[in-house]
């Protein structure tokens, strides 16, 4: 990144931010789809039942913890790879 001039660094940063937003939206969409499909079963009311609310809360917490854990593993692997390459 040090080899890039200021304009190139700015463009690179913009691309990184766009990718992060895209990844976040993919994560969020996956969370909504999965938890809705697994938890919402009663379409006779526009409100969630207490059972559905509880299920969605547990589902979203589990999904986010899993995603966080996967991210940590990627960081660990990248660090190990970086050390292996002599960085």
From Swiss-Prot:
Lineage: superkingdom: Eukaryota
Chief location bin: mitochondrion
Subcellular location: Mitochondrion inner membrane
Any one GO molecular-function label of the UniProt entry: metal ion binding
Cysteine pairs bridged by disulfides in the record: 35-59, 39-55
Database matches in SUPFAM superfamilies: Tim10-like
Statement: the UniProt record of this protein carries the keyword Membrane: yes
Spans traversing the lipid bilayer: none
One Pfam family per UniProt: zf-Tim10_DDP
Coiled coil (residue ranges): none
A Gene Ontology biological process term: protein insertion into mitochondrial inner membrane
Mode of membrane association: Peripheral membrane protein
Motif Twin CX3C motif, residue range(s) on this chain: 35-59
Cellular component GO terms held in the UniProt record: extracellular region; mitochondrial intermembrane space protein transporter complex; TIM22 mitochondrial import inner membrane insertion complex
Keywords, alphabetical: Chaperone, Disulfide bond, Membrane, Metal-binding, Mitochondrion, Mitochondrion inner membrane, Protein transport, Translocation, Transport, Zinc
Domain notes: The twin CX3C motif contains 4 conserved Cys residues that form 2 disulfide bonds in the mitochondrial intermembrane space. However, during the transit of TIM9 from cytoplasm into mitochondrion, the Cys residues probably coordinate zinc, thereby preventing folding and allowing its transfer across mitochondrial outer membrane.
Function: Mitochondrial intermembrane chaperone that participates in the import and insertion of multi-pass transmembrane proteins into the mitochondrial inner membrane. Also required for the transfer of beta-barrel precursors from the TOM complex to the sorting and assembly machinery (SAM complex) of the outer membrane. Acts as a chaperone-like protein that protects the hydrophobic precursors from aggregation and guide them through the mitochondrial intermembrane space.
Protein name: Mitochondrial import inner membrane translocase subunit TIM9
Species of provenance: Candida glabrata (strain ATCC 2001 / BCRC 20586 / JCM 3761 / NBRC 0622 / NRRL Y-65 / CBS 138) (Yeast)
């Amino acid at each position: 990144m040090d080899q890039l001039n200021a304009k190139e660094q700015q463009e690179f940063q913009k691309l990184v931010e766009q990718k992060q937003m895209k990844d976040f939206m993919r994560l969020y969409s996956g969370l909504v789809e999965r938890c809705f499909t697994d938890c919402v079963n009663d379409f006779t009311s526009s409100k969630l039942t207490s059972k559905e609310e509880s299920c969605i809360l547990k589902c979203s917490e589990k999904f986010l913890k899993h995603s966080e854990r996967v991210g940590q593993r990627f960081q660990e692997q990248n660090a190990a790879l970086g050390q292996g390459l002599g960085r």
